[in-house]
Regions:
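Short secondary-structure boundary/capping segments
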Residues: 4-5, 52, 130-131, 137-138, ...
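Short-chain dehydrogenase/reductase
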Residues: 61, 146, 160, 176-178
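Conserved hydrophobic/aromatic beta-strand scaffold that supports enzyme active sites
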Residues: 166-168, 176, 184
Length: 194
């Protein structure tokens, strides 16, 4: 099994693998080009997003700067907006449904590390950099979701996440949730009629 296959399967993998580093550098270059493209040059921005991302739905708007790990593991539905300074660490799939609004400074992480340091690092005597071992899990964001600033999420359809929330577990559909840790505070009553 390749390191990329391990990564997508959620197994411990080596981020320093040559294939993964090549994909990572490619994504960083494409994201840099996107972030530096003139704001009014929507044609070039669309071309770059189509090259960078796994899927670009109709009517996608991403305000730079936008940061990714690989880009190719991010799948957008239709009619989505991502505000400035968002970071998507797509070491596994990030699937975003239709009609999703993502506020500034939202961070979506699919990667995590073992808790014991001996499981995270291969200690060597040579002078090369040793990447820590990593695992992943997909993040799926349902449709009709509005995400406030600064949130890490796994949520259902028709959900609102309050700004500054830290979401560490699934949030059910048709709810309004916020806090650290993020908790459901009430039903999103109107969404049930959509």
């Amino acid at each position: 099994m390749t390191e990329k296959e391990k990564m997508l399967a959620g197994e411990l993998y080596d981020c320093g693998d040559a294939e993964l580093l090549a994909l990572w550098h490619r994504a960083k270059d494409l994201a840099r080009d996107y972030n530096l493209t003139n704001s009014s040059d929507t044609k070039r921005k669309s071309e770059l997003l189509n090259e960078l991302l796994g899927k670009v739905g109709n009517q996608l708007w991403i305000t730079p700067p936008f940061h990714v790990d690989y880009g190719c593991n991010i799948y957008f539905g239709n009619n989505c907006e991502v505000n400035m300074n968002c970071t998507f660490l797509d070491d596994n799939k990030i699937i975003i449904g239709d009609n999703v609004l993502i506020a500034p400074n939202v961070q979506i992480y699919t990667a995590y590390h073992p808790t014991h340091y001996l499981d995270r690092f291969t200690i060597s005597e040579n002078e090369t950099f040793n990447f820590c071992k990593t695992q992943t899990a997909p993040v799926i964001i349902g449709k009709n979701v509005w995400i406030g600033g600064g949130t890490i999420i796994l949520i259902g359809d028709n959900t609102v996440i309050g700004a500054g929330s830290v979401v560490t577990k699934d949030i059910p559909a048709d709810t309004i949730a916020y806090g650290n840790p993020c908790k459901v505070h009430k039903a999103n009553e109107r969404s049930k009629s959509i």
